[in-house]
């Protein structure tokens, strides 16, 4: 997500390290991340997490997690207020380079529509798929599903006629109206899946 990345870059550009961020006020953190939305809520969670890790481990670092299993890391990270399954799974994928596919609303919706899962919440979708992603593809699987969900498999009026997964999709309410304008879907990296 562009805005999340920009918020991350703002923090990295403004402060020298995560220990410095931990010492900042929630308002200063919020100023740097507001572009990503929910600035007050997220800044509080970030401050709480960084402060707690620094207090418990002596410095802000995720290195202590490297020898933990994925499930142990999920348990460890979600014990902090404001850190849910999605955030913890993003840490696993993006920071610790684990083969984990975080599940947001787009991933949840597309996997349910296609018929890969039959779950009611993103967290339940995550639990259903977390150990089933073939090694080495979680990152591309995650990013392609997000893009598919944003650009084609939208919540209302999905553009099913251009979907590369149309033939395998189990969604009952397919919208095959060709009049919907769509961006070219050459972004799909499904050959890797």
What is each residue range found by the language model?
Residues 1-185, 189-190:
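Catalytic cores of DNA base-excision repair glycosylases
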Residues 193:
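Acidic, metal-coordinating catalytic segment for phosphate/diphosphate chemistry
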């Amino acid at each position: 997500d562009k805005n999340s990345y920009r918020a991350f870059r703002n923090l990295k550009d403004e402060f020298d390290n995560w220990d410095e961020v931990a010492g900042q006020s929630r308002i200063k953190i919020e100023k740097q991340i507001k572009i990503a939305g929910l600035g007050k809520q997220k800044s509080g969670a970030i401050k709480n997490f960084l402060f707690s890790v620094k207090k418990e481990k002596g410095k802000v670092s995720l290195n202590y997690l490297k020898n933990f299993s994925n499930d142990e890391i999920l348990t460890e990270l979600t014990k902090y207020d404001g850190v849910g399954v999605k955030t913890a799974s993003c840490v696993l994928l993006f920071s610790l380079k684990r083969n984990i596919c975080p599940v947001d609303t787009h991933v949840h919706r597309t996997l349910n529509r296609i018929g890969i899962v039959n779950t009611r919440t993103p967290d339940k979708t995550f639990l259903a798929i977390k150990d089933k992603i073939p090694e080495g593809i979680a990152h591309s699987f995650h990013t392609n599903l997000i893009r598919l969900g944003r650009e084609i498999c939208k919540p209302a009026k999905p553009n099913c006629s251009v979907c590369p997964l149309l033939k395998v999709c189990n969604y009952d309410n397919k919208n095959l109206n060709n009049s919907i304008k769509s961006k070219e879907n050459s972004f799909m990296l499904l050959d890797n899946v």
